[in-house]
Amino acid sequence: DYNFESGIPESFHVLVKELKSYGIGPGNGDSFIQPFDITTGIKLKDNNHAVLNKDSLAVETDYIPLSFSSSGITKGPVVFAGYGLNINEEQLQWNDYAEIDVKDKWVMVMRHSPERENSHSLFSSHSPLHKKMLVARDKGAAGIIFISQLEDEGLLPLSYIPGYNNAGIPAVHLSNDVADKILSNNGWSRQKIQETMNRSFESISFYIDKTILKISIDLE
């Protein structure tokens, strides 16, 4: 948080003098200063925990909430929805939600796109995490889970993105080990999914058997 009173520039005093010369008084009691707070960062608070079926997951080891996540407790089954994209453009059609109902469920999606290495790809503008979250939210998902491609190791950092905090549904990034553990319930792995989608250029989606995820997210 930033308190404007802690650093008043000289130009402010000049402006106040000019306003007074026109007979204009302060709008905030006896002062021309209007204090305000802005968010410049984000951090984990005390109530962050998760349970996958009956196994506890460790925050910052097995998963990490993302800065645009909502806070609260969310529990539900898990479905996998490819890259989490819903694109209907003249030059590109791709809908990872066409064959599944994600309402009131956790939707698990892979980061990036089938054309990750192509900076001019038509997928690029649809691939940011917060955009995939908005698609999931609009589809009625209870929350969104991001998993990494084979090229990525480790969890994403919890870093503040202006304008995207508390965007409506919980959003987390799972570790590679936990992601593969969940996918194995249906005979899949991150490698098999990524290679199949990228080779066929077709979405893969499915309901994940016998999987209930409960996550409490507490961000400040």
Regions found by a protein language model. Give the residues of each.
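Noncatalytic luminal/extracellular "stalk/propeptide" segments of secretory-pathway proteins
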Residues: 1-114, 218-220
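Short, solvent-exposed loop/turn segments at the edges of secondary structure
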Residues: 74, 102, 139, 166-167
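Catalytic cores of large soluble enzymes that bind and process phosphate-bearing ligands
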Residues: 3, 7, 124, 128, ...
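Sec-exported extracytoplasmic/periplasmic mature domains
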Residues: 16-25, 41, 84, 137-142, ...
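Long, well-ordered, tryptophan-enriched scaffold segments
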Residues: 142-148, 162-164, 168-220
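A conserved hydrophobic secondary-structure block that centers on an alpha-helix together
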Residues: 81-156
